């Protein structure tokens, strides 16, 4: 049975980015995906500067930037007034902005650079052997690889972790979301209002991603709720169709490595999407792992992978804490608490803390950001 150097399980943005990077390094890499078709929609939309820099190795950055809106400025607002501006264009980085584009576009760019995806392949088991990993596949012959990377989202955790090993905290908060045609230009805006947050991020083609806090109960009519919430909280009337509601949860795995099996992305950690760091966290997992896998898959001892694991776990915990802070700030509040929150944010963001805040939200504090 032939043995692949690296097998990547999962062809979402994280798995594709890893496979494309490894392919550019000349690694024999295979990519399998249980879904028979590419998922539609614009789930994660923002790619931060550290990930953009690391995507250069595979050639993906140029293709992404050709399709993206570059967000150089963000605004925190409350009660119709500007609390503070967030200046990504002042970052000391190769890419001092956030690249915003539909996730489907990101996947198209990465797919063109990655090896062909073998779709309809459901991985059922991973068994360590002396010189690699045997991969059990539903209804097909086993596969073998020197190293296996699980990048298949939360559904892939059972391949690596026992039940209960990855503790998951479900937040009570509900949100509604839609991509709409709306004014606003290439500026990201976060409206921190008494009734809850509204996030408004630019997308190509004059569209925007809108996300609104919706309390703690299921929303029966997401489109109607979002229309009313945006009008009340921001004063902007929009036409919302195709809105959806979602909840948030937090999980960080205790380890990212089991012998020759590595776990990256949502399979290893989930953070609230409020703040837009989840996909980037996975991309940074993959893109910092790639240069370590190349020698390991060719007979090396995996030197550096343990350090990589420690760094990525630390970054995941940091991102989870920041996402929790975003969730707290986005909840509804009474008049006094709202006034106090607005005053505190205005003071913090316009003072020395503003630069640190910008670094944190641009993921410049992630351990993978050094040198990017």
Range-by-range predicted roles:
Residues 3, 231, 292-372:
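C-terminal helical "tail/cap" subdomain of flavin- and related membrane-associated enzymes
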Residues 43, 47-109:
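Active-site-adjacent segment of FAD-dependent monooxygenases/related oxidoreductases
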Residues 2-14:
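Beta1/beta-strand and adjacent pyrophosphate-binding region of the FAD-binding site
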Residues 138-147:
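Core beta-strand elements of the Rossmann-like FAD/NAD(P) dinucleotide-binding domain
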Residues 23-43:
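Glycine-rich FAD pyrophosphate-binding loop
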Residues 119-133:
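A conserved short coil-to-beta-strand element within the FAD-binding core of flavoproteins
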Residues 147-248:
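Conserved FAD-binding catalytic core of PHBH/FMO-like flavoproteins
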Residues 13-20, 24, 246-325:
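Conserved mid-domain beta->alpha element of the FAD-binding
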């Amino acid at each position: 049975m032939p043995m692949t150097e690296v097998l990547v399980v999962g062809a979402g943005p994280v798995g594709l980015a890893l496979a494309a990077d490894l392919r550019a390094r000349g690694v024999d890499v295979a990519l399998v995906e249980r879904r028979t078709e590419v998922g539609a929609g614009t789930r994660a939309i923002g790619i931060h500067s550290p990930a953009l820099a690391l995507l250069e190795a595979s050639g993906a950055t140029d293709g992404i930037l050709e399709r993206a809106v570059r967000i150089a400025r963000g605004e925190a607002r409350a009660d119709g007034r500007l609390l503070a501006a967030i200046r990504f264009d002042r970052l000391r980085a190769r890419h001092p902005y956030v690249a915003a584009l539909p996730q489907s576009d990101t996947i198209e760019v990465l797919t063109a650079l990655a090896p062909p995806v073998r779709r309809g392949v459901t991985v059922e088991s991973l068994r360590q052997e002396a010189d690699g990993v045997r991969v059990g596949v539903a209804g097909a012959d086993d596969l073998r690889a020197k190293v296996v990377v699980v990048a298949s989202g939360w559904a892939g955790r059972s391949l690596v972790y026992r039940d209960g090993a990855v503790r998951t905290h479900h937040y009570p908060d509900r949100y509604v979301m839609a991509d709409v045609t709306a004014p606003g230009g290439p500026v990201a805006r976060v409206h921190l209002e008494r009734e809850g947050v509204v996030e408004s991020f630019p997308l190509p083609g004059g569209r925007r991603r809108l996300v609104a806090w919706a309390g703690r109960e299921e929303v029966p009519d997401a489109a109607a709720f979002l229309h009313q919430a945006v009008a009340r909280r921001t004063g902007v009337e929009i036409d919302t169709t195709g809105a959806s509601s979602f909840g948030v949860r937090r999980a960080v795995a205790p380890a990212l490595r089991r012998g020759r099996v590595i776990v990256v992305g949502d399979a290893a950690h989930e953070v609230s999407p409020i703040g837009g760091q989840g996909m980037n966290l996975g991309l940074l997992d993959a893109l910092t792992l790639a240069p370590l896998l190349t020698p390991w898959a060719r007979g090396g001892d995996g030197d550096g992978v343990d350090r990589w694991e420690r760094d990525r776990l630390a970054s995941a915990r940091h991102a989870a804490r920041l996402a929790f802070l975003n969730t707290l700030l986005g909840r509804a509040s009474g008049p006094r608490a709202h006034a106090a929150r607005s005053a505190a944010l205005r003071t913090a963001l316009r003072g020395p803390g503003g630069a640190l805040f910008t670094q944190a939200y641009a993921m410049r504090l992630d351990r993978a950001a050094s040198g990017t």
